[in-house]
Amino acid sequence: YFIDGYHGGIYGHYPVGQTAFIAQKLRQNPNWNINIEIEPESWEVVRQRDPEGYEAFKRLFKDQSVESGRIEYVNPTYAQSYFFGTSGESAIRQFEYGMRLIQKHFPEAVFTTYSAEEPCFTSCLPYILKSFGFSYASTKNPNTMWGGYVSAYGGELVNWVGPDGTRLTTVPRYACEDLQPGSCWQSISWFNTKDYIHKCLDTGIQHPVGMCIQDAAWSHGWDKGPWLGQDTAAYYTPTAYKTWRNYIQDCSVGTTQDDWHFSQEDVLGGLMWGTQVMQRLAGEVRVAENAIVRAEKMAAYARLYKGMEWLTERIDEGWRTLLLSQHHDCWIVPYNQLQGKKTWAETVTDWTGVTNQNSR
């Protein structure tokens, strides 16, 4: 089995025509199913600049059933945050604001499995995910390990146990899932090679799965559609492309007694956290996190005891810019230009500045 799909958005990478491209490839490949993590703000931009592609994608997305649905939204967070460098409240708001915006464009969206192409993981996720209605997760990120990855543990399924004891059925980065030889940014599950599948089978994994959530960048080399390609000699056959929920519910062993007591030490960050720019970004984000939460508390007191107006738009915009400042690209490519203008690091200063201003 293989997990394919697309990762990106208007802040990271989402060229004009990307939505129409995905819809076209789905029509051309009826046995191809995908998993997506697209920044939620992208959809309003797509609706305006590519209405035909937008509507074609919406028609394909509408079927959210486990058996016949072809698209699963696996990371609905507002800005695909790494989580392990921010607060628990920020993690909650990433999901709350992201899911709310996605459902404006896709009211039938069902959020079943959490998965990410980047190392967007933290120890408290089982509780947060379950509170938002998720049933499953995966801790694989085999093709984008520059920012880090989680510990290798277990077999086909594990119960990811958070610090509060919450359990979530999860496809882990298998104990046998080593880094790709000669690479520090890929694991061997990035492509369903015969060696990878046989290694899994030999360790008792009955239904092994590989994964690559491709960059949403069809005009920049990511334009082949199904990741494994047409040359079946290059990978293990038969291989079926699945949504995560279809794989876990209908193809995997389904349940497990293997409890993985996941701690923050299982998040193996690969960023240069000691650099000055990282320290500055982390400080700016933390100041803004504290400011917006403090402002919400005071606004609640003012509402309850003084009957003052609840400033919904001001608070929401403060959270929006804070969530964007936690985008993984702010941390992994801080000196790259964002949309050809300021760098990501400079934009974090702007975004957190709005949050701080709105918190006063």
Residue spans of the language-model regions?
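Catalytic-domain carbohydrate-binding cleft regions of carbohydrate-active enzymes
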Residues: Y1-R360
